[in-house]
Amino acid sequence: MRERAAGYPLPPHGHHPNFVGAKEAAAALLAHPQVAAHRTLIVGADRALYPLRKLALAAGVVLYLPDQKREGWYFRVDDVAGANLKRSREVGEPKLRPEGATAAVLACVAVGPGGGRLSKGYGWGWNGLPALGLPTYTLAHRRMLLNPLPCPPDSWVRLIGLPGEVTECPTSETGSLAP
């Protein structure tokens, strides 16, 4: 917070931190060819992902947002108003499965250059979405990049959207993320 890198809500304790430059990081990630090809995404409900939700919906991408009150449920949203979580209940359609989703964007607390993602340790998406087998991406401020990570990652991401750029994470020959 002393560096003025954290954004609302403050303090960032207890949730994935929002950060200054999140909109630029979202724009960079959405413009990356690996992400731009997806027309339906699962996107976390974290404040740091609000700019990504808004930009994606404005570009015609369909989003599935996790229902914060019913575990395992999503809201299918195609209206820009649904980028705001309070409005997603009004404009979204409740779904048990994210039908047609081809990738996911999850928030992080920290991420390593190799794609290891640390979450807040609980809640939706804390350990990624392994059961769905989808490529996963994240947004981060440069101060959230740690090498090495202080503990084993919760999950792995293929791309890290940073303000103004995207970092590609190494993959194995089979396309799965390198451990």
What does each of the following model-derived ranges do?
Residues 1-20, 24-39, 58-62, 71-179:
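Surface-exposed, charge/polar-rich loops and edge strands
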Residues 43-47:
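Structural motif
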Residues 49-50, 125:
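Alpha-helix N-cap/helix-start and coil->helix boundary motif
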